[in-house]
Amino acid sequence: MADVFISHSSADLQFAQFLQRHLYGESVSAFLAPVSLSPGEHWPQEILSALSSSDWVLFLASRSACASPWVQQELGAALIAKKKLVPIVWDMPPSELPGWVGHYQALNLAGASTAEIQAQIAAIAGRIKSDKAKGLLIAGLLVAGLFAFGSKG
């Protein structure tokens, strides 16, 4: 199970791979279909499975991604499942995001240097790891509570 699902247009694969590499460098696992899927896998099913098991969706919101029916389906599923969604823009202003994602605060990387982009990726990775740690703590407390409750009987 990946921590993050990267939704992107195939035209943006190079940037998606850059993002995935830097997330891995920050100890955050990321599903990226062209890299994460093995030959012979039924990719629509695997993509939906990866999306449903990831808590976060990073949407590489380029003009081509916003026009892609596949990306729209992925984001529709993410919105319905109430995933934590971060639109990342670089080739258009956030104000041009489609209405179905325009109300999410976007990360605007237009004109950012490689070092600035890496710093922003590290910041997002920190949020994801913090969120994951909170979830693990809650799960641990629930298990401990169930164990304590069960041992009283």
Annotate each language-model stretch with its function.
Residues L85-W90:
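Conserved beta-strand/loop subsegment of P-loop NTPase cores
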Residues S10, S62-R63:
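Short glycine-/small-residue-rich Rossmann-like dinucleotide-binding loops
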Residues P93-Y104:
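Glycine-rich, charge-decorated loop segments at or immediately adjacent to ligand/cofactor-binding or catalytic sites
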Residues M1-W56, K83, L137-G153:
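Conserved N-terminal substructure of TIR/SEFIR domains
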